[in-house]
């Protein structure tokens, strides 16, 4: 992927009041009209999400970007999302990420070199029996790898359907980069843990459960994780239930298998949002996902008790890098005809990655 290197944020943006920055953003939106689209992920901070033309999870935003005709897409999300937007839009459209440092630690846990080395070892061991699936929280190169080898992308919303689709193609699935989403999805489909193994890209070995038979392994999980969701624990669930037995616990499937099994419900951000919408007034919910979304849900549902499963949970730090300062600056530059924050995926990579994305979008 190619990105333009930005200069340091001009100091005067830090000195502006929030009202001044918000006014600049509104002026830019009015200036561009339909030629500007601002998609915002559910995990964005409140002062930024107010300017989103559309709010959604990874699947919804991917579909939106593939349908829009706006010339400029200023993506309030993280790096891999902006890459996906660029790959699903035309060459005449421009995708801007307000802060190029808004990455994803999970996506960085699977490099293309590591993945190709793993594939070589695994296909040597298992033959032509494996189909690769990648969570959309991955780099364009990993998506392209999956497209090249007959695989596809998945989101937390459609992971079950995509794993079922994969098993209709090959007897084994390689799921990367999030081991927890892969494990929880496979288990929900009835696959026992003993038939899953974890590929460690640092030791270049398959990690099996004690007593597991390597010949029976049908799900190969990449040793990656979300640094936010992995912080939720079974002990936190126990503490909530000890304090408030009537509270329901709902978590994201990027949490560990133990946490998902201990929770009352588990599902994507879209699932969590819809569950809260449909919940009866007066009900109590402990939510295991990113804090910006939890706080927003608490505000949107004053008739319910909504709080984080982890009372001192930090925000997704990279998602939180998209702030008013960077959004205002990127839009000011765009008005001057400067696309200093443009995300551009090389066409050879994009073509194969689009194949993986297209297989997903055709299946959901």
Curated annotation (Swiss-Prot):
Where mainly located?
A: cytoplasm
Under catalytic activity, the entry for this protein gives: iminosuccinate + dihydroxyacetone phosphate = quinolinate + phosphate + 2 H2O + H(+)
Q: In which pathway does it act?
A: Cofactor biosynthesis; NAD(+) biosynthesis; quinolinate from iminoaspartate: step 1/1
Binding positions for iminosuccinate per the UniProt entry: 41, 58, 135-137, 156, 252-254, 269
Alphabetically, the GO molecular function entries are: 4 iron, 4 sulfur cluster binding; metal ion binding; quinolinate synthetase A activity
- Do you know which InterPro entries this protein is assigned to? NadA (IPR003473), NadA_sf (IPR036094), Quinolinate_synth_A_type3 (IPR023515)
One Gene Ontology term from the biological process aspect of the record: 'de novo' NAD biosynthetic process from L-aspartate
Under Enzyme Commission nomenclature, its number is 2.5.1.72
Its Gene Ontology cellular component terms are:
cytosol
Give a yes or no for keyword Iron in this entry. yes
Tell me the residue numbers annotated for binding [4Fe-4S] cluster.
Answer: 104, 226, 316
Q: Where in the cell is it found?
A: Cytoplasm
Q: Which cofactor does it need?
A: [4Fe-4S] cluster
| CC cofactor note | Binds 1 [4Fe-4S] cluster per subunit.
Enzyme superclass (EC): transferase
Q: Which UniProt keywords apply?
A: 4Fe-4S, Cytoplasm, Iron, Iron-sulfur, Metal-binding, Pyridine nucleotide biosynthesis, Transferase
> Which NCBIfam families would you find in this protein's record?
nadA (TIGR00550), PRK09375.2-1 (NF006880), PRK09375.2-4 (NF006883)
Q: What does this protein do?
A: Catalyzes the condensation of iminoaspartate with dihydroxyacetone phosphate to form quinolinate.
> Which protein family is it in?
Belongs to the quinolinate synthase family. Type 3 subfamily.
Q: Which HAMAP family match?
A: NadA_type3
Question: What is the protein name stated in its UniProt record?
Answer: Quinolinate synthase
Organism for this UniProt entry:
Shouchella clausii (strain KSM-K16) (Alkalihalobacillus clausii)
Per UniProt, what is the name of the gene that codes for the protein in this document? nadA
């Amino acid at each position: 992927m190619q990105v333009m290197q930005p200069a340091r944020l001009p100091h005067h943006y830090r000195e502006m009041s929030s009202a001044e920055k918000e006014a600049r953003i509104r002026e830019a939106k009015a200036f561009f009209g339909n030629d500007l689209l601002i998609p915002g992920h559910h995990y964005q901070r409140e002062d930024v999400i107010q300017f989103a033309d559309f709010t959604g999870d990874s699947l919804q935003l991917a579909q939106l970007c593939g349908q829009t005709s706006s010339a400029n897409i200023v993506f309030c999300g993280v790096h891999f999302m902006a890459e996906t937007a660029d790959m699903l839009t035309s060459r005449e459209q421009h995708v801007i990420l307000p802060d190029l440092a808004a990455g994803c630690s999970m996506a960085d846990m699977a490099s293309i070199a590591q993945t190709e080395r793993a594939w070589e070892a695994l296909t040597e061991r298992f033959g032509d029996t494996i189909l690769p699936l990648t969570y959309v929280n991955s780099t364009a190169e990993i998506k392209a790898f999956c497209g090249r080898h007959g695989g596809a992308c998945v989101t937390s919303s459609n992971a079950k359907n995509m794993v079922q689709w994969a098993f209709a193609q090959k007897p084994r699935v390689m799921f990367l980069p999030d081991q927890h989403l892969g494990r929880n999805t496979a288990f929900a489909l009835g696959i026992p843990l003993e038939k899953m193994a974890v590929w460690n890209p640092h030791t270049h070995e398959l990690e099996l459960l004690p007593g597991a038979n390597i010949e029976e392994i049908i799900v190969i999980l990449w040793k990656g994780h979300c640094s936010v969701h992995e912080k939720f624990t079974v002990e936190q669930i126990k503490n909530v239930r000890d304090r408030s037995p009537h509270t329901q616990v709902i978590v994201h499937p990027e949490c560990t298998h133990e946490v998902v099994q201990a929770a009352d419900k588990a599902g994507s951000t879209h699932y969590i949002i819809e569950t809260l919408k449909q919940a009866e007034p007066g009900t109590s919910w402990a939510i295991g996902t990113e804090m910006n979304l939890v706080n927003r849900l608490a505000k949107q549902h004053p008739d319910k008790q909504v709080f984080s499963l982890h009372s001192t949970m930090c925000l997704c730090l990279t998602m939180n890098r998209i702030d008013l300062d960077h959004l205002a600056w990127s839009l000011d530059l765009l008005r001057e005809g400067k696309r200093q924050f443009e995300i551009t995926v090389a066409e050879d990579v994009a073509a194969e990655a689009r194949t993986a994305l297209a297989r997903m979008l055709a299946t959901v």
